[in-house]
């Protein structure tokens, strides 16, 4: 089974991420996962017995939970998870990396130094 990532969020306090995915017959799920690979909009993932393939390559991704999709649940995650990169097309600098547990920003932002 393949899922296409339609949207994503990262949680800087837990080091986890959420991916809104769509599969066969437009069946949607929200994947809560952790790993050293960030699923971006447009990524295609395939769960396999040996792990998770993302865009055809095995990646270090651990799926923590799969939620059935609802607008209310996705909105709740979006409203409660505070990351400057969530919901924007690009982010170049982040003033909040001191509070972030990610070693490298999943969105590619650099730390703002003052």
From Swiss-Prot:
It is found in: Cytoplasm. GO terms for biological process: cellular response to starvation. The keyword Cytoplasm applies. The keyword Ribosomal protein does not apply. One of its GO terms (cellular component) is cytoplasm. Keywords: Cytoplasm, Stress response. Disulfide bonds: none annotated. InterPro entries: Anti-adapter_IraM, PmrD_sf. HAMAP family: Anti_adapt_IraM. Involved in the stabilization of the sigma stress factor RpoS. Belongs to the IraM/RssC family. This is Anti-adapter protein IraM. It comes from Citrobacter koseri (strain ATCC BAA-895 / CDC 4225-83 / SGSC4696). The lineage of its organism: Bacteria, Pseudomonadati, Pseudomonadota, Gammaproteobacteria, Enterobacterales. The gene is iraM.
């Amino acid at each position: 089974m393949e899922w296409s990532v339609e949207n994503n969020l990262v949680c800087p306090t837990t080091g986890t991420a959420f991916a809104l995915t769509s599969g066969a017959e437009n069946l949607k799920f929200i994947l809560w996962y952790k790993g050293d690979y960030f699923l971006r909009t447009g990524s295609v993932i395939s769960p396999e017995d040996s792990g998770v393939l993302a865009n055809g390559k095995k990646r270090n991704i651990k799926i923590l939970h799969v939620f059935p999709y609802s607008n209310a649940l996705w909105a709740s995650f979006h409203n409660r998870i505070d990351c400057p990169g969530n919901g924007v097309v690009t982010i170049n600098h982040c003033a909040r990396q001191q509070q972030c547990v990610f070693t490298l920003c999943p969105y590619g932002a650099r730390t703002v130094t003052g």
